Amino acid sequence: MLIKLLTKVFGSRNDRTLRRMRKAVSLINAMEPEMEKLSDDELKAKTNEFRARIEKGESVESLIPEAFAVVREASKRVFGMRHFDVQLLGGMVLNDRCIAEMRTGEGKTLTATLPAYLNALSGKGVHVVTVNDYLAQRDAENNRPLFEFLGMSVGINLPGMPAPAKREAYAADITYGTNNEYGFDYLRDNMAFSPEERVQRKLHYALVDEVDSILIDEARTPLIISGPAEDSSEMYKKVNKIIPHLIRQEKEDSDTFQGEGHFSVDEKARQVNLTERGLVLIEELLVQEGIMDEGESLYSPGNIMLMHHVTAALRAHALFTRDVDYIVKDGEVIIVDEHTGRTMQGRRWSDGLHQAVEAKEGVEIQNENQTLASITFQNYFRLYEKLAGMTGTADTEAFEFSSIYKLDTVVVPTNRPMIRKDLPDLVYMTEAEKIQAIIEDIKERTANGQPVLVGTISIEKSEVVSRELTKAGIKHNVLNAKFHANEAGIVAQAGYPAAVTIATNMAGRGTDIMLGGSWQAEVAALEAPTEEQIAQIKADWQVRHDAVLAAGGLHIIGTERHESRRIDNQLRGRSGRQGDPGSSRFYLSMEDALMRIFASDRVSGMMRKLGMKPGEAIEHPWVTKAIANAQRKVESRNFDIRKQLLEYDDVANDQRRAIYTQRNELLDVSDVSDTINSIREDVFKATIDAYIPPQSLEEMWDIPGLQERLKNDFDLEMPIAEWLDKEPELHEETLRERILAQSIEVYQRKEEVVGAEMMRHFEKGVMLQTLDSLWKEHLAAMDYLRQGIHLRGYAQKDPKQEYKRESFAMFAAMLESLKYEVISTLSKVQVRMPEEVEAMEMQRREEAERLAQMQQLSHQDDDAAVAADLAAQTGERKIGRNDPCPCGSGKKYKQCHGRLS
């Protein structure tokens, strides 16, 4: 009550932010007459004037009124479009490191030109991030004339582009690209073998379009670059034959049904578990197939990989459904993005799941992959000095944006009042009754000439609705992952009178639905249209536009509620743009996934009490409230999963930053001999310590063992026993010095053969190669540690603390291995002439190229994170030599991860 009263008096934080920004809007409007008087050349010259002022020390923020006024005037001249005041507000919000919530049709693309221009003035680059390649290309080409008029260069970063083209795109003032491509380029840059191979500049300002889709929906799926591992396709086929013999346990919560099934399915957690009965049966079947020996247990240490195959096959059969989670096209299993309904060509599930699905579908099984590099979007986007984003629906996720990314959400008012009618949900007992009611609604609406957009949550559901519409003789378009090539075209014409369009989820997001259809699309379809043709097309469009307005605008039908209220709001947001009329309604049934998992018993109980008859719908505040509560439950569970994933990845992120910092320093120097000399001392000291313990008696020394180790690992023949016999005065310290001196002498002789310059080049190559190889093994070890760490909870230990402690110990061990491997490799390589070093270098490059060609870029299905709590810090701060090491060891950076730098 008190908070409401205070808000009434002082306004909400959102109101106060907008009030402050409106003062700047008044300033920009006051400058408009002055800007209109400038010639084109004078307006263009403003860019260089602003750049000069920034160089002299003026802040970018102080230029906001003038810079925004310049962009608005340039837009009027280039596009004939003037930024509305609310778009200026949106631009300021985006410059203020905030999320701007702007409704569909409010011109987010034009709004983005303001902060993009302003932040590009510093010369550090601006990355505009979109959800797909089509939108990146479209927005870049649409805005290019405006930016080029103002003297700014525009680049487009697309998958599959050669490195020089990518480098050019990143060197531009403003670069457009997808979130995946920016992330993969970052990972690839940190796998480069020379500074010239890197394409990105320092990450300065990211402006993320559809920010909720990228930073929230996709936050659980890390970006992974992986290379091929060993072939195990036969094992997937053998295990796949066994799974159909298992029966699913129907009531997993009931003790009375415990013995009936062979495996239980937890739909919420997306997990499958064998029951006792299932374990006995599967062990029998594995023995029959000759995969496992009689008397062996599936859970014995030697069968860990087999257990991995069984679990993957069970998940593939029980949790992943064709045409919902994936489609099969041209003998290939292609993932369908659960949030957008689009296919994700080239993406693969990890942990053997993709291979298990391929075995289930009987298509060719491709090799499993080994992770070479990975990062989550959460950690990638926090590397930018400055981050902002825009979307039509962010307010429901404001807490998450604030807690994880330190981004506040500001709701920008609409240019015209919203007049769309959002009708209450209708709930039916069965799916069939619901579909029938939807068909009747569509018939009624289209009879009046009203266009209808039907939103479904999967390809399968869109095809069910499509079949029923075909039976009813209603013409319609289907927009799903199977037919996404003509996506923008179908969406653009979805506003035609009486048009019916079925779209999965948010397919077609980013393209406006114009009432009466898009006259621009009709003009674009003509070859060299005349003025008369264009005028006729516009006149015809105006008639259609008025007819659709009279019929009530675009009607949205949701065929079921999504897990997230935000995605339901996005579907509704396709209607009612720029003050247009419109309406929306969701149709639900007790058989929908959300209702079945979260709201089923209570709501069906209510419906029975209310005496529901077949075909009747319920429209009641209780039901709506129960559904909203179910969605809130799912949202909070998904938020916890994302938060836990981030807290886990933060541990790996500290290590990743330390490794990538060292790797980049290594790439940028040509001479690493000082580092080699320093680690040689460490390595030989540790090696000698193992056989001659410090301050020990001579009787405790293992001289034969030391001689053998030096020979095997460093190719050094040293008659240490002879030295000790001939020189009694030789004590522990002088012996250590002699061994090190001898090793340096042998190495210097090698250097004389090939020359110092070639040796420096070779040393750097060996260090990079060894670092990459060990980092790859370390990532695999971290994956294994992560998968089982939750079991520590049963021993009353905090899994997150255990993960931190063990991963740090593994990281420290990896750094020690790195030193040892580098010195061992450099000592053992027999070089007789410079050409041999060149040949080795060539071989290394060919191997790197081969790996690059075989790399898979994938989204990992990662819903099994365990809780952790680390503070999120935005931006990549350079670690000082005397700062505490980011790994949490308590040591200084220079004495820990920084020792190689």
Curated annotation (Swiss-Prot):
A GO CC term attached to the entry: cytoplasm
Summary of subunit composition and partner proteins: Monomer and homodimer. Part of the essential Sec protein translocation apparatus which comprises SecA, SecYEG and auxiliary proteins SecDF-YajC and YidC.
Family from the record: Belongs to the SecA family.
Cofactor(s) needed: Zn(2+)
Name assigned to this protein: Protein translocase subunit SecA
Reaction equations catalysed: ATP + H2O + cellular proteinSide 1 = ADP + phosphate + cellular proteinSide 2
Induction (UniProt): Repressed under conditions of excess protein secretion capacity and derepressed when protein secretion becomes limiting. This is regulated by SecM.
Chain sites annotated for binding Zn(2+): 885, 887, 896-897
Leader sequence segment: none
CDD domains assigned: DEXDc_SecA, SF2_C_secA
